[in-house]
């Protein structure tokens, strides 16, 4: 646990250092390119929560969508932590007015079922509590 905290502290210090350097020069530099990381990683889950919140907010569908499967998760370090996510999402039984869709069941009626493949890139600065959608590309499957 101590090793994990040391690594996390080092990462935060490095990102902050790079962040200041990038702000000085005006263009983010890639400190570490995208690498595969575990789907269960806390920041992947946080980025995915944000991506789905933004997807549902922008969608014209009457129902919320929720993640069915995470196909790929990667992290890149620039002036922030960037998460590349490939996911399958599906329409739930919860209408948007219901709010939170964490516990919503997926549509069972064949006429209402809808599955979508999405690629999201989310920028995160956890030390500033900032999240930003850099890319959202989705298509029906």
UniProtKB/Swiss-Prot annotation:
GO terms under cellular component: cytoplasm; extracellular region
Signal peptide: 1-24
Keywords per UniProt: Cytoplasm, Disulfide bond, Protease inhibitor, Secreted, Signal, Thiol protease inhibitor
Tissue expression summary: Expressed exclusively in testis. Found in spermatagonia, spermatocytes, round spermatids, elongating spermatids and spermatozoa.
Disulfide bridge partners, by residue number: 94-104, 118-138
Subcellular location: Secreted; Cytoplasm
Principal location class: secreted
Record site: Reactive site: 26
SUPFAM superfamilies in alphabetical order: Cystatin/monellin
CDD domains attached to this UniProt entry: CY
MF GO annotations: cysteine-type endopeptidase inhibitor activity
Chain segments carrying region Secondary area of contact: 76-80
Function: May perform a specialized role during sperm development and maturation.
Protein family (similarity comment): Belongs to the cystatin family.
Stated name of the protein: Cystatin-13
Originating species: Mus musculus
Gene name of the encoded protein: Cst13
């Amino acid at each position: 646990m101590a090793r994990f905290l040391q690594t996390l502290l080092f990462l935060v210090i490095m990102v902050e250092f790079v962040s200041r350097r990038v702000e000085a020069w005006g263009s983010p530099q890639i400190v570490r390119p995208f690498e595969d990381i575990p789907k269960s990683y806390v920041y992947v889950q946080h980025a995915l929560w944000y991506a789905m919140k933004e997807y549902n907010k922008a969608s014209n569908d009457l129902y919320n969508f929720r993640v069915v499967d995470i196909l790929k998760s990667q992290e890149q370090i620039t002036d922030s932590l960037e998460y590349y996510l490939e996911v399958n999402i599906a329409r739930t039984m919860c209408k948007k007015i219901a709010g939170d869709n964490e516990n919503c069941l997926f549509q069972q009626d064949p006429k209402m079922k809808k599955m979508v493949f999405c690629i999201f890139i989310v920028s995160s600065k956890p030390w500033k509590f900032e999240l930003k959608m850099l890319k959202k590309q989705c298509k029906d499957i």
